[in-house]
Amino acid sequence: MGRTLVLIRHGQSEWNIKNLFTGWKDPGLTEKGHAEAITAGKNLKAAGLKFDIAYTSALQRAQKTAQHILEQMGQSDLPLIKNSALNERDYGDLSGLNKDEVRQQWGEQQVQIWRRSYAVAPPNGESLRDTGARVWPYYLYHIQPHILRSQTVLIAAHGNSLRALIMALEGLNSEEIISQELTTGIPLIYTFNSDSTISSKTIITP
């Protein structure tokens, strides 16, 4: 299968279940998170995929997700390229704080703006636009060339870094991206035409 990109949000992390803003903090996966990544690898193998190259962020929850997938596919020796350009959005002063407590302090409306608006960043953090400003150039210069050479590429990363990438890939506007949600451990498969436009999009559910 040529010109293929698989995106996957890391499996459930320890801070996901604690309801904490994570950002660039580095908690590991929960038992469920490990299982989600293993299942994703099995499903990708069953779909007949084989990766030529794999990318992930500088954070262990994404790295371990990628490792589980490659192990299940019999490709544990494939180089895994790690780069902070694919890191989760930096939540700044909110990082490590409980989401419910932040809502109580700042108000539901303000927190929703920080979490889901395109251009508004939390204090000392990144907006989705800021996140896209590092994700998209990295994709264009380092990842897309492999896809255009008819290779199959894995990116294991994070909810907001992947949302920023999807926004650019699909040409979504700042309103459309607000409703885009990525479930932990669920692969999203794109195939591309030779001119880099999207040919197909498939979600592999457990």
From Swiss-Prot:
Keywords: Gluconeogenesis, Glycolysis, Isomerase. Pfam families: His_Phos_1. Its EC number is 5.4.2.11. Substrate binds at residues 9-16, 22-23, 61, 88-91, 99, 115-116, 159-160. Pathway: Carbohydrate degradation; glycolysis; pyruvate from D-glyceraldehyde 3-phosphate: step 3/5. The active site is at residues 10, 88. Gene3D superfamilies: Phosphoglycerate mutase-like. GO terms for molecular function: phosphoglycerate mutase activity. The record marks 158 as: Transition state stabilizer. SMART domains: PGAM. It is an enzyme of class 5 (isomerase). InterPro entries: His_Pase_superF_clade-1, His_PPase_superfam, PG/BPGM_mutase_AS, Phosphogly_mut1. It catalyses: (2R)-2-phosphoglycerate = (2R)-3-phosphoglycerate. GO terms for biological process: gluconeogenesis; glycolytic process. Catalyzes the interconversion of 2-phosphoglycerate and 3-phosphoglycerate. NCBIfam families: pgm_1 (TIGR01258), PRK01295.1 (NF002339). Homodimer. Belongs to the phosphoglycerate mutase family. BPG-dependent PGAM subfamily. This is 2,3-bisphosphoglycerate-dependent phosphoglycerate mutase. The lineage of its organism: Bacteria, Pseudomonadati, Pseudomonadota, Alphaproteobacteria, Hyphomicrobiales. The gene is gpmA.
